[in-house]
């Protein structure tokens, strides 16, 4: 519910079950959005700035697939080198932190977490029914896992462009 589909650019799969009119070229960046409408904008922006993606998944209300599931999948995906997340909430924060810490050692995770302001928290809650997490706890989770937190989608893609095209230390 509340999602807009998925996209996999692997030539062996080549699956597009989104509502997006266009999508970015094949590449090594995996993306996920908890917001369907924002997902379409993310795909369009990635196409405009020519960031190649390996896969894109819209999670919506996370009724079937969560960020935990996606991180586990992308951890073993040879087509994915960088992971981008747009999150409105965490389903199981401890499990998410444990998985993200491990995955982030091999593949950088860059995240935009909505709901930093009170208005943003209300919007996220009304959109997917997700409870907003406390900002202090969210910031601590990102620090402890080593994920890179960005404030805007533009910053998210700037970080992704750098990491997708430069060897990691």
Predicted regions and their residues:
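Catalytic-core regions of core metabolic enzymes
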Residues: 1-169
């Amino acid at each position: 519910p509340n999602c807009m589909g998925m996209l996999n650019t692997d030539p062996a799969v080549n699956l597009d079950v989104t509502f997006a009119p266009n999508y970015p070229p094949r590449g090594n960046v995996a993306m996920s959005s908890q917001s369907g409408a924002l997902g379409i904008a993310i795909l369009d922006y990635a196409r405009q700035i020519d960031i190649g993606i390996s896969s894109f998944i819209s999670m919506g209300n996370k009724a079937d697939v969560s960020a935990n599931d996606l991180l586990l999948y992308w951890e073993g995906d040879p087509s994915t080198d960088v992971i981008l997340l747009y999150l409105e909430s965490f389903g199981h924060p401890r499990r998410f932190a444990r998985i993200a810490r491990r995955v982030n050692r091999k593949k950088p995770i860059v995240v935009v977490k909505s709901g930093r302001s009170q208005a943003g928290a209300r919007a996220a809650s009304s959109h997917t029914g997700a409870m907003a997490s406390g900002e202090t706890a969210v910031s601590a989770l990102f620090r402890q896992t080593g994920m890179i937190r960005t404030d805007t989608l533009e910053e998210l893609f700037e970080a992704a462009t750098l990491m997708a095209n430069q060897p990691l230390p």
